[in-house]
Amino acid sequence: MPKQVDHRERRETIARALWRVVDQRGVQQLTLREVAQEAGISLGQLQHYFASRKAMLTFAMDLAAEQTAERVGQGLRGLGEHPHPREVLRVMLLETLPLHPDARATSRMSAAYVLEALHDEDVRTRARGGLLEGRALVEHLLRQAVADGHLAADRDPAVETGLLLALTGFTTLLELGAVTAEEVVAAVDSHLDRLFGGG
């Protein structure tokens, strides 16, 4: 059992090194050699854990998704036992956007994965599956909100899901300094207020 933990730990260390390469030097520098150097190990050692760039990138993306889910879970626990769906969606949206260092690292990892997905069918299928899963979760929350009377019955959950997910488009604007974090949070809050009848 300890060997498995060590193996997972080493893979996570390599994945975090990959995040740093993406964050500090860009996707174009994302090679096995570059990541090995960043992780402080030899190329051979890295290849013991990841046979290919794609395997390494996929694991790093899975870890980024896990980290985001953990942050969302932590935020949701802070809302108490029966949080309003508006607050649940707010936590989910804000933790997806690069508003703080941890979210920025996972967001940049996601961007690297999307670029890879454009040219690799396997990666595209996997990435698309994750996005569809996220979309289904948001739509389920909205359908439940309608059923519970938190959201007007004339709201179309599928359309509203699309509009909520469109807010993640702030990622590019934030990364390029076209908007501030405060402006993004205000826009998210304004949209949620209108959606749930508070504005």
Regions found by a protein language model. Name each.
Residues L94-P101, R108-D120, S190-L195:
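Helix-loop "lid/cap" segments that line or gate small-molecule binding pockets
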